[in-house]
Amino acid sequence: MANSNNQLLKEIRFDWNKEEILEILNMPLIDLMWESQTIHRKFNKYDIQLASLFSVKTGGCEENCSYCSQSIYSASEIKSHPQFQVEEVLARAQIAKKEGADRFCMGWAWREIRDGKSFNAMLEMVSGVRDLGMEACVTAGMLTEEQAARLADAGLTAYNHNLDTSPEHYKNIITTRTYQDRLDTIKRVRNAGINVCCGGIIGLGETNGDRASLLKVLSNMNPHPESVPINSLVAIEGTGLEDNQEIDSIEMIRMIATARILMPKSKIRLSAGREKLSKEAQILCFQCGANSIFYGDELLTTSNPSFQSDRKLLKEVGVSFNKDFETREKTLSSL
């Protein structure tokens, strides 16, 4: 590897090139894991953030993302749902907090935020979640500068807007929104003073070069995204990518480790597809730098490890987390 470990530890960079990233991504696995854990332990406490994700409005999205069952272009049989009421969402957030989550993420299957009753309700939800003492994150598509400012005023902690894949591979995945649209949205979020949550998906038919290119875009953002969700494709029947093969867990470990090396202080979130990983693979991801997970039985329209299995896993690993949930019997799936 061109950079020694000492060089990697000296500074946080925002000028990575694709060749450097590919070299890291393709390192012998044991060396890669050692590099990433060394950096992780230097910059971060050894704990795991528990983030609960709730689909506030499900289905009917106007985008044609080929991996997504919520798209109007998908033939998937999902249960669409109109926007939940503010009180229902805050009740869900309250139970998530009691179960141990300290971030509550809310998702809307929209192309973009539109002013009006639904947006006003979103602002109430954000404010209500913050009043519970939790971090609040929203993912709802594109937004304007004014909307970003109003979300900031409501107390929004972070806005999620993933890049999905590399600029080069992007056109093979979605055509109803450009890569630049995504970057512009992220800029508006950042200009409003809201933390950026931005990551991608592996298993979309991309090459290793595409993965390096995606990580280049993310790691050259200054500052780095506050949190970086790394997802593996959950191939859903009826979507354009329903026949894609599952990725090997080693590929996820490599992606997590490389992201940690490139973005030492970001929360690297082990996200969709985690249910397919063995307990041992998840532990290796934590060792390599993953320090956040989505917590609860469902991620929008895909399944997730159960509350009980995550509680057991975290205890076995010995990481620190919010222990308020240990005496609770009600689970997120009981709502």
Curated annotation (Swiss-Prot):
User: What name has this protein been given in UniProt?
Assistant: Biotin synthase
Superkingdom of origin organism: Bacteria
What residues does [2Fe-2S] cluster bind to? C105, C137, C197, R269
Q: What is the lineage of its organism?
A: Bacteria, Bacillati, Cyanobacteriota, Cyanophyceae, Synechococcales
Q: Where does [4Fe-4S] cluster bind?
A: C61, C65, C68
Q: Name its species.
A: Prochlorococcus marinus (strain MIT 9215)
Looking up PROSITE patterns in the UniProt record yields: RADICAL_SAM
The GO terms describing molecular function are: 2 iron, 2 sulfur cluster binding; 4 iron, 4 sulfur cluster binding; biotin synthase activity; iron ion binding
Q: Which gene encodes it?
A: bioB
Q: How is the cofactor bound?
A: Binds 1 [4Fe-4S] cluster. The cluster is coordinated with 3 cysteines and an exchangeable S-adenosyl-L-methionine.
